[in-house]
Amino acid sequence: MKRELFNYKLPANLIAREPASERRGSMMMVIDQETNDIKHRSFSEIVSLVKPGDLMVFNNTKVMPARMFGKKDTGGKIELLVERLIDDQTVLGHLRASKSLKIGSKIIFDGCIEALIQERREDLFIIKFSGDQSAIDALESKGHTPLPPYIDRPDNDVDKERY
């Protein structure tokens, strides 16, 4: 399948910048299995749409506050987006900085959490947090909720609860 088949124009005014204040106010896409017709319905209508024998999959996952902002030991700004936890103090993630990143460089997040760039694996980096603080504790205390690029605003406390 070609990637360009997924490109389409979506008017900016149709992109939600904030989640619905109540989940039942959220919208969902409903596809009729017989006609392939697509309809957009309020989530509060879900009970009337479910039939005996339908399979329901519940997703109770939460978005980890996986984005951190910091500085390199040289003073340059850096952004980390954690892709996965490797062990208690080590993560695999994307690093974005104004200049190239060197293995062995120190990063200081939020002025108090130190980490070391240990290795590069293609587009990702292995980062080890220093000291007693685990990676998950660092993310929980200083991490930001990663929002999709089309939501052009900083994250907030509501995002931590809703995502």
Regions found by a protein language model. Give the residues of each.
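A cross-family signal for N-terminal binding/gating loops and helix N-caps
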Residues: 1-163
